[in-house]
Amino acid sequence: RNKLRTLKKIVLLIITISLSTFLQAQQGWTKDQQQVQQAVVRMFEALSNRDSLSLKAHCTADTTLYEYGQVWNIDTLINKAITLNTAGDFKRTNTFEFISTETDKNIAWVTYRLSSAITRDSKQITIQWLETALLNKEKKQWKVKHLHSTLIERN
C-alpha cells in the first residue's frame, strides 16, 4: 500500500513537472491573456490557502459559480471550501492547462483543465475539472465574475 502511495506521488510529480514545462512552453499568449490566466491561478491559490480575503479580492462582488449542478455565490464557496474545511493537514496543489483565452477590453473568458491534488485527513485525492471562467476588469485588475465547472474525474 505504501509503495502504491509512493508511486502515485511520483506519477503526480511527473505530471506536474510535465504540465509546468508544457505551460511555460506555450507561445502566443498576449500579455492581457496571461494576466487573465494569472487571475484565475491566483483565485485558486487563495482557495488552496483558505484565504477568504484574497479570494474575494480576485472575484467580483457578484461572482457566481456553477458547481455540481448548483449555483453558488462567493459566500457559499467560502463556507464550503474554507469555513467547513477544518482539516489540519489540508493541502491543495493546482495544475492548469489553458485551452483558450479571449479578451475584449474589460471582459475576458478562459477555458482550462484544472487538476487538483488534495490532501485532507491523511487522504490524498486528485480531482480533474474542465472549467470556463468569465472575468471583468475592475480598476485595471482582472477578476472572476462567473465560473462554470464540470467534474471530469475524481480518484
Put a short name on every predicted segment.
Residues 59, 69-70, 113-116, 148:
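A mature extracytoplasmic/lumenal domain signature
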Residues 81, 96-101, 114-116, 130-136:
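Hydrophobic/aromatic beta-strand elements that line small-molecule binding cavities or substrate pockets
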Residues 128-155:
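Short beta-strand edge/turn micro-motifs at domain boundaries
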Residues 1-30:
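Bacterial Sec-dependent N-terminal signal peptides
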Residues 101-108, 123, 135-141:
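A short, structured loop/turn motif at beta-sheet edges
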Residues 52-103:
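A solvent-exposed, acidic/Ser-Thr-rich amphipathic alpha-helical stretch
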Residues 89, 116-126:
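Short, cysteine-centered beta-strand-loop-beta hairpins and adjacent loop/turn segments enriched
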Residues 23-57:
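Short, low-complexity N-terminal intrinsically disordered segments enriched in polar/charged residues
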